[in-house]
């Protein structure tokens, strides 16, 4: 941490609140304790995936409600695409409900674009939080489509060593200098494993 944190290298902190990982990890635990409504929750959770494979990071009240990033700061966490697939696979293994992959879900939309590197200047909050077609209708895709977009976009976002970029590294709040050149061998292997499972 001494070389990865620009401020107080011996200090860890948390921001609180319920985020993307919490959402999917809650589903994982509910699969073991109260599996009845987990399929419906999983379907709604996929509405937090953007069309570029990134995800909403703030969870609103109730299932399927997502909020743009705090303070208007574009954030992309490189591990976010792992959780939906891990959870959905366990759900299918536990229930046999393979048809969940064919169910439709919308895509989240806010001003963040191009995997958090640009702002969509044409987006207006009045448009709502869903990706729309050129005709103004909410675009939906299968859950399988959501999974493929997430996995492929994350897998191909690599750094100078052809390893997945670390991006924000927010699961370790002591690293705030990883966004430029940080890479993760562990998550590269995890995404490769997810792609093998999808194949």
Please identify what each model-predicted range represents:
Residues 1-8, 12-21, 27-32, 38, ...:
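Structured secondary-structure scaffolds
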Residues 2-9, 57-75, 166-183:
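Acidic/His metal-coordination segments adjacent to aromatic residues that form catalytic metal sites
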Residues 23-24, 195:
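Residue-level signal for cytosolic alpha-helical hairpin/rod architecture
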Residues 156-170:
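C-terminal ends of transmembrane alpha-helices
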């Amino acid at each position: 941490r001494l070389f990865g944190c620009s401020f107080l290298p011996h200090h860890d902190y948390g921001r609180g609140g319920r985020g993307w990982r919490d959402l999917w990890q809650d589903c994982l635990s509910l699969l073991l304790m109260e599996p009845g409504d987990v399929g419906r929750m999983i379907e709604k959770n996929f509405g937090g995936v953007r069309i570029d494979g990134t995800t909403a990071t703030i969870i609103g009240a109730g299932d399927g409600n997502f909020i743009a990033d705090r303070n208007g700061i574009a954030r992309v966490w490189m591990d976010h695409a792992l959780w939906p697939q891990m959870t959905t696979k366990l759900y299918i293994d536990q229930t046999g409900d393979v048809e969940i992959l064919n169910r439709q879900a919308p895509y989240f939309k806010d001003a963040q674009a191009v995997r958090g590197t640009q702002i969509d200047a044409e987006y207006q909050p009045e448009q709502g939080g869903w990706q729309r077609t050129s005709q103004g209708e909410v675009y939906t895709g299968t859950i399988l489509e959501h999974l493929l977009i997430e996995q492929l976009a994350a897998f191909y976002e690599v750094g100078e060593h052809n390893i997945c970029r670390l991006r924000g590294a927010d699961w370790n709040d002591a690293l705030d200098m990883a966004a430029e050149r940080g890479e993760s061998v562990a998550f590269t292997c995890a995404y490769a494993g997810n792609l093998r499972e999808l194949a």
